[in-house]
Amino acid sequence: MADDKGGRSRRPGSALAVDLRRARRARRDAQKVSVIPPVPVTHGPTIDCADREPIACVREWFASEGWKPFPFQEEVWTAYLSGESGLIHAATGTGKTYAAWMGPVMEWLRDYPAPRPAGDQLRRRAAAPPLRVLWITPLRALAADTEAALRAPIEDLGLPWTVESRTGDTEPKVRARQSKRLPTTLVTTPESLSLLLTWTDTPALFEHLELVVVDEWHELMSSKRGVQTELALARLRQWRPQLRTWGLSATLGNLDTARDTLLGVGPDRHSRPGRIIRGLVPKGLQIDSLIPETMERFPWSGQIGLRLLPEVIQAIEEGKTSL
């Protein structure tokens, strides 16, 4: 035990624990200031989709980003366009978001092939289609990143859609606007969705809904928030019987149970049909060891981990995604 200036005992590593709390607080503050403003498309399309197959436009957009669609992504797009629902099971960082997102994008390009040019933001918002896609995320911190990822292709492909989020962090003026007209795509949490469903005019707001995506389904399943999500989905299916539902997950054991829980039961009290699409994308494994620069003391009681805590925090912050 060590003594501080006041003579009280202090446990080893307490200073590092303080550093950890400060680092967490700094990350939370950074997330608050990095919220992306919910504005519609502000520039014209960079990819001309006139007289072209939607899949060709989407592949060109992927190529413009330096990517190539994985087979499992195209399998999901085909299933969605066929009216199917299901569960996407793929490792973190393999493209589950665009696997679920490009289906409704291609559907719009197929049904409404003429892109609309960019214009005044207010006029574009007024001309945007009503709510078509509902994206449920378990964490408010993911809403801003998800919103940015969804907005990127619709801007480049010329879709007249709006993408906004509605969470506990949403500004009051945005909430007020959404109470009159929801965006074409809404990113929200189970709690915010449950409140949204209590509005008197909710059935009218959701009358054009085509798709619900439940992100990180493993985080919600078998929890109170998961039950909350299931109840919300059941309510939406009463209004929209043909509603398509897709779940995204990277870590699930029993995929059949996860899919059946997500899709619920139909009027016949049997499980709704749905696909399970696996993203078997090979990923390389690289192991880096964090070793103290100096070894003047080498405690065997586990305190070496606390000594390396700042290095671990730095490694986590440098990574794009961390588990």
Regions found by a protein language model. Name each.
Residues 97-107, 227-232:
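Motif I (Walker A/P-loop) of helicase-class P-loop NTPases
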Residues 106-145, 239-242:
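Conserved SF1/SF2 helicase motif Ia
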Residues 132-146, 247, 315-323:
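Conserved strand-helix element at the start of the C-terminal RecA-like helicase core
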Residues 169-186:
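Conserved motor-coupling elements within RecA-like helicase/translocase cores
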Residues 142-165, 260-268:
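Conserved helix-turn-beta segment of the N-terminal RecA-like "Helicase ATP-binding" lobe
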